[in-house]
Amino acid sequence: MNLCWQKSIYD
């Protein structure tokens, strides 16, 4: 799971 891109979406 890539929290990097997920964080960008949620941010």
Curated annotation (Swiss-Prot):
The record's function comment reads:
Modulates the action of auxin, and may function as plant growth regulator that alters phytohormone responses. During symbiosis with Sinorhizobium meliloti SM2011, involved in nodule initiation and essential for bacteroid development during nodulation.
Q: Which InterPro entries match?
A: ENOD40 (IPR013186)
Q: Give a yes or no for keyword Metal-binding in this entry.
A: no
Source organism per UniProt:
Medicago truncatula
Keywords from UniProt, A to Z, are: Nodulation
Q: What's the protein called, per UniProt?
A: Early nodulin-40-2
Knockout or disruption consequences? Reduced nodule number after inoculation with Sinorhizobium meliloti SM2011; remaining nodules are abnormally spherical and contain a few small rod-shaped bacteroids, their development is impaired. Bacteroids development is arrested at stage II-III.
Show the Pfam families listed in the entry: ENOD40
Its gene is ENOD40-2
Q: Name one GO biological process term.
A: organ induction
